[in-house]
């Protein structure tokens, strides 16, 4: 009965960019299962909607709901959903149980699916599976038969002629993309939204040293980052003047960043959404991990490499525990040397 054209499905994806990328294979399977259905998604930021525009799956509508803009916008969206009359709601696996129940009650689909019905969410699964696989668990009852879990695929538009010429002029021994940021922050005091902690950051000093080693090897570097990473640029002032460095921090949209990754031999960074994007575009990635588990949170695909070792900290990965935010030394990341990262990049691009 689910194949009828009037079936309306809403998928809740109110999370970050990396989580959105990980949802793409499930959305693809959902469209294959229900080719005539109306499939809508709701995301938290416009950048997430931009990512889905490049996904290899047809979606009918992508709504942006800024959950931080107040109760009014949430009420307005819920009212719109009730007017649409969704038959099916699907919850992202890492939305908490209580938030899922509130959200589904607000939008009021005929029925909804998600692992939250079992009283769990991704953060309580203790490293059982990858984000990508968790999305399939969320829709398991709906998809019914066994589905082969595949990697996310993003298809960005082509570079402009000017950008192409700029990158080609820099290519000596290839281009390596460097995501200079420390990833999103968490709060020490979550309810008060106070005490920002960059739990996954490797440090801009390490990034600067890595960039220098790459340049000294004849490798050109393109720097990736958003508005938040612009604050780190003063720490890189001595390398920004090099003709081997292309600084795109704060200068590109998500779609443009995707285009640029296509010209890279490799993209390196910490556990960020950009690493998921690069892998989904088909580019080899080298990701630096510490408090999160690369095999559950990392880029999904056979070209993804991870720098991670539990010997650096016996409590790693600590994501989901109090230590994730309250740790004071971050030795799981600090003990990863620039040379170690550089050597793995060299192996990948050669």
Please give the residue ranges for each predicted region.
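Catalytic machinery of carbohydrate-active enzymes
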Residues: 1-350
